[in-house]
Every structure is written in structure tokens, then in C-alpha cells.
Swiss-Prot record:
Pathway involvement of the protein, from the record: Pyrimidine metabolism; UMP biosynthesis via de novo pathway; UMP from orotate: step 1/2
Function according to Swiss-Prot or TrEMBL: Catalyzes the transfer of a ribosyl phosphate group from 5-phosphoribose 1-diphosphate to orotate, leading to the formation of orotidine monophosphate (OMP).
Protein name per UniProt: Orotate phosphoribosyltransferase
One Pfam family named in its UniProt record: Pribosyltran
Entries under InterPro entries matching the protein: OPRT, Or_phspho_trans_dom, PRibTrfase_dom, PRTase-like
EC numbers on record: 2.4.2.10
Chain positions recorded as 5-phospho-alpha-D-ribose 1-diphosphate binding sites: 31, 78-79, 105-106, 109, 111, 130-138
Organism this protein belongs to: Cryptococcus neoformans var. neoformans serotype D (strain JEC21 / ATCC MYA-565)
């Protein structure tokens, strides 16, 4: 793990997530059945202050060299909708880059404008905004939506948290690494497990939690390439 200090956007996001109970430490059973010493609940990202901090962190990643140039943010229903919207606003405020955003309906609308897509036309270079990639099922469903639009080209994915742990496929790779290899696009997080560990180390207030997270990482963790 790099000894480089966390940047201010990551620190602000982690501190806000802890303060609002979005990032929790304890004993949690994941969908995979694993017992995890930490849990990230993106469903609690509903206050204006926390959304602002989250959007700023997204915008920083979106404007970095790690994400190719793009035209539209796509936020998969439901959690991705608000995340894409606030990220588009923050990106414009930070950089002046004027991009569109869109999202899908899970139920097709047969009146008014109709269809399953809302917002900017799904064409050009697309970046998907999501929260946490677990099994990879949801992100593959989102990519299938893009594939149905011949004018859309996926160029990247930005997620809230990379758990940096081995997936369930037996490959020894994380879900993020598998998605990157399968689709040939970068998957960049606002924070990863290494960042959480680094924050706990630097704070000096979470020694018990730090030890548990380190143990979990030693058993299940993978390094980002």
C-alpha cells in the first residue's frame, strides 16, 4: 500500500460518511455471506451537506486523467440517479465542463414522453455513476442498457467505494478488476479499502476498528492494479 497521504476530497468524504452513519464499523453480514468489519450504506446519502461532499468527490475523479473524456453521465436506477445529477452539477462548478446526465426507469412509461430513459440522449461517450460494485450484476445490467443504444459508447465507470476484495468467481480478482477486464474500461472509486485503512491509521482514534479491517483485508483483500 502506498504511504502517500490521502487527498482532501477523500478525507472529507470519509469523515462525512462516518459522521452521517453511512460508513459504519462493527460486524456485518454481506450478501456474499462474509462477515465484514465495515459497511457502506449508500441509501443514507440523502442530506444536502453529504450529497454536496459526495458530488465534489465524484467530480474530482471525473475530471482526473484516470477517466477518459466523456459526454454524458448515466445513473442507473435507483441510487445512481441522484448521484449522477449532483455529480454533473459539481463537475460544472469545478471545471466549467457542461455535460448531460440521464437515467433509466425500471418500469417503462407508456404515456407522456414514454420510454425507459430520462434526461440527456444516451449517445456519445458515456460514464456510468454507481455506488458499490458487489457481485457485478447491477453494473452489467447498466452496461446492457448502453449496449441497446448503438450511439452510446461506455468509456468509464466511477463508483463510491471499491471494497478491494476477492469476488465470488474463484478467480482471485475483485469484481472491479473483473469488470475492467471484461469491458476494457477503467472503474475508478472515490475511495477504496486501502483509503479507509489509511484514514483509520492517520486518525489515531480507531485502533480496534483498524485491526479488524486489517485482518479482513489480509484474508479477502486484493491490490488495485
Amino acid at each position: 500500500m502506498s504511504s502517500q497521504a490521502l487527498d482532501s476530497a477523500k478525507v472529507a468524504f470519509i469523515e462525512a460518511a462516518i459522521e452521517h452513519g453511512v460508513l459504519l464499523f462493527g460486524n456485518f453480514t454481506l450478501k456474499s455471506g462474509r462477515q465484514s468489519p465495515y459497511f457502506f450504506n449508500a441509501g443514507l446519502l440523502y442530506s444536502s451537506s453529504l450529497l454536496s461532499t459526495t458530488a465534489q468527490a465524484y467530480a474530482k475523479v471525473l475530471s482526473s486523467s484516470r477517466i477518459p473524456d466523456f459526454d454524458v453521465l448515466f445513473g442507473p436506477a435507483y441510487k445512481g440517479i441522484s448521484l449522477a445529477a449532483v455529480s454533473a452539477v459539481s463537475l460544472y462548478q469545478q471545471t466549467g465542463k457542461d455535460i448531460g446526465y440521464c437515467y433509466n426507469r425500471k418500469e417503462k412509461k407508456d404515456h407522456g414522453e414514454g420510454g425507459t430513459m430520462v434526461g440527456a440522449p444516451l449517445k456519445g461517450r458515456i460514464v456510468i455513476i454507481d455506488d458499490v460494485l458487489t457481485s457485478g450484476k447491477a453494473i452489467r445490467e447498466a452496461i446492457d442498457i448502453l449496449k441497446a443504444s448503438p450511439e452510446a459508447k461506455l468509456v468509464g465507470i466511477v463508483q463510491l467505494v471499491d471494497r478491494q476484495e476477492k469476488g465470488q468467481s474463484g478467480s482471485g480478482k475483485s469484481t472491479v478488476q473483473e469488470v475492467e477486464e471484461e469491458f476494457g474500461v477503467p472503474v475508478e472509486p472515490i475511495i477504496g479499502l486501502d483509503d479507509i485503512v489509511k484514514y483509520l491509521e492517520s486518525s489515531g482514534k480507531w485502533e480496534k476498528e483498524l485491526q479488524e479491517v486489517r485482518k479482513y483485508r489480509a484474508e479477502y483483500g486484493v491490490q488495485r492494479s
